[in-house]
């Protein structure tokens, strides 16, 4: 049965833009022993997608203010306790202790893509969440090193103990093309000053073009997991962010995974 499943997946891989048939598996192949781990990956991937969407629309709102680029610096985003996303623009002070916020954009309602932006003059000094996140981001960017294409960055809480996850992911450079791969995740201490763990998520960058041939319909995407036996947080982000919305099949050493368009992951045993 494993060989039949493999063949079905290869059909998807070879015809991702030509109306490929999705493989069908019975429930006997589902492995729910991975459910807690997969649900955690889904949760992080969904948070990455929300962060990216907030950064996009928050930036648009701030740009309408015609901001002073010398005050902009970088950006950070977070989902507040009231459920609304907030995006701030600024930079760390010379000592790296305070984050100086020059502009802020706040989501009007939960789930909304409209943000209200404001200029902060004088700049707001934050020595807490944003300062720690900014230091963690600098740690991750420095560890990742120089890049030869645009990259997006995300900083999210890693756990209740206050550590950070810093992600670097290639940004789209062409309409309708969604890059997958060439990304990394760093775990940084609560104060944002110490690198604790490095995780390479994917090696090469796949430029996924979601434009089907005339008369064809895209049914799913496909790629192999080389570095680990599990999907990555950014696999979920990729599915949630690209258009059109289609599932992604991932083949690892021991499993086939299906990432649904809502980010939920199902594991199927290969043997």
List the predicted regions and their residue ranges.
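Gly/Pro-enriched, hydrophobic low-complexity segments
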Residues: 184-201, 214-217, 222
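Short, solvent-exposed aromatic-acidic interface loops
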Residues: 93-94, 122, 198-207
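A short, surface-exposed beta-strand/turn
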Residues: 99-116, 178-196
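Bacterial N-terminal signal peptides
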Residues: 2-13
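Signal peptide processing junction and immediate N-terminal pro/mature segment
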Residues: 12-21
């Amino acid at each position: 049965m494993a060989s039949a499943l493999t063949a079905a997946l290869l059909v998807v891989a070879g015809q991702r833009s030509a109306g490929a048939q999705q493989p069908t598996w019975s429930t006997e192949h589902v492995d729910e022993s991975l459910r807690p781990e997969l649900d955690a990956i889904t949760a992080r991937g969904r948070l990455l997608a929300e962060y990216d969407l907030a950064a996009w629309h928050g930036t648009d709102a701030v740009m309408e203010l015609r901001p002073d680029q010398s005050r902009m610096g970088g950006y950070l985003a977070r989902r507040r306790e009231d459920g609304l996303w907030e995006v701030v623009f600024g930079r760390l002070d010379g000592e790296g202790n305070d984050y100086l916020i020059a502009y802020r954009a706040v989501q009007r309602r939960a789930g909304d893509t409209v943000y209200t932006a404001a200029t902060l003059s004088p700049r707001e000094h934050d020595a807490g969440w944003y300062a720690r996140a900014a230091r963690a981001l600098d740690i991750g960017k420095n560890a990742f090193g120089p890049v030869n294409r645009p990259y997006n960055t995300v900083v999210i809480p890693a756990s209740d103990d206050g550590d950070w996850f810093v992600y670097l992911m290639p940004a789209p450079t062409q309409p309708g093309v969604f890059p997958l791969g060439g990304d990394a995740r760093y775990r940084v201490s609560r104060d944002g000053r110490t690198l604790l763990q490095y995780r390479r998520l994917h090696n090469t960058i796949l430029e996924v073009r979601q434009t089907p041939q005339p008369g064809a319909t895209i049914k799913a995407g496909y790629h192999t997991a080389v570095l680990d036996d599990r999907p990555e947080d950014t696999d979920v982000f990729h599915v949630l962010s690209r258009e059109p919305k289609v599932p992604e099949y991932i083949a690892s050493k021991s499993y086939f995974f299906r990432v649904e368009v809502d980010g939920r992951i199902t594991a199927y045993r290969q043997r």
